[in-house]
Amino acid sequence: MSKGMSEIISKGIIKAQNKVQNKAQNKEQNKEQNQEQFMLDKDEYRYRPWLFFLCAYFFTWIFWIPAIFVSEDKGAILMLLGLLAPAVVSTVFVLVSGCEELKRDLKEKIIGFYKVKWMNVVWAVIIYALIIVFSILFSLLFGQSLKQFSFTEDFSFTGVGIGSAFVTITLASIIEEVGWKGYCEDSIGQYMDWFIESLIFGILWSFWHFPLLFIKGTYQAGLMISPLYVINFFVGAILMGYIITWVYLVSDRSILACMIFHLFVNFMQEKIAMTAETKCVETIVIFIVTAIIVLLNKKMFFGTEHVGRLLKTRFGEGN
């Protein structure tokens, strides 16, 4: 082999080695840049979901449990204080967080009318109205009556001394959503996809109502005539957690949208003359609707782009 040929081969080998080295260096640099960008995109605030639930349960039940043993009038203030607890805990968690971004986020979620996708709220209301319609129709198979397509004269509970029953369900819809959407759901969603988040939240939110079963005058106390009705309430609440999470996300995490939907659900549950048996059928219908919503929004429920950077993520139609 000539000297010239050896030099050409040698230069070719060196060039190939340099190319491999440069490629490896560029790959390492890109990896470092991606890691740096990920750190920049991550939320600075660390959510504490389990501490929130401990506080929310404690400051609710510390008032509701004593309300079991007193008269309705005397228990009124205890009921109201317990109802306020999650919203107060949520607000305190945000205010003492030291995170201006979290404080601004809560403000926007509550009063940000511009965040509400009004047509999505309308569709959510229509969907729930259809759930009621189909539940009553299916209940005919179990001997129920078409007379359920009517409004009741009164609410099924007394309002527990907090004013009228309508005022009670209105307050519950507003106050609960400030607590659960103000901090709670985000604190879970920060660490996992929304499908698992909805399941965890639904279970914990459902069980939060437990003492109400034993407080005279409440809707839940009226269910104690049958274990089936009690179980149905808790299962239905878990499933509704998925639907209201959907309403929350398609309106870019608007609490106002959830308040409107929650109020409509509470009102329909009370004023439509469905029997307790039909409400058990309703839970089956809600399960079917929940499955459809999840399947049609797989990216929203199973995506993890928001994990670790929820405050920097925009939600809506495309999520």
Residue ranges, per PLM feature:
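Functionally important transmembrane alpha-helices
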Residues: G222-F287
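Residue-level hotspots within the lipid-embedded alpha helices of multi-pass solute transporters
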Residues: I169-I174, S206, F233-I238
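Membrane-helix boundary elements
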Residues: F195-I225
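Hydrophobic/aromatic residues in alpha-helical transmembrane segments
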Residues: F134, L171, C184, M240-I244
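Membrane-interface helix/loop boundary segments of multi-pass membrane proteins
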Residues: I175-F207, L249-S254
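Alpha-helical transmembrane segments and their helix-entry boundary regions
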Residues: P49-F53, N120-V121, Y183, E197-S198, ...
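Short, Lys/Arg-rich, polar N-terminal cytosolic tail immediately upstream
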Residues: S2-V20, K27-E44
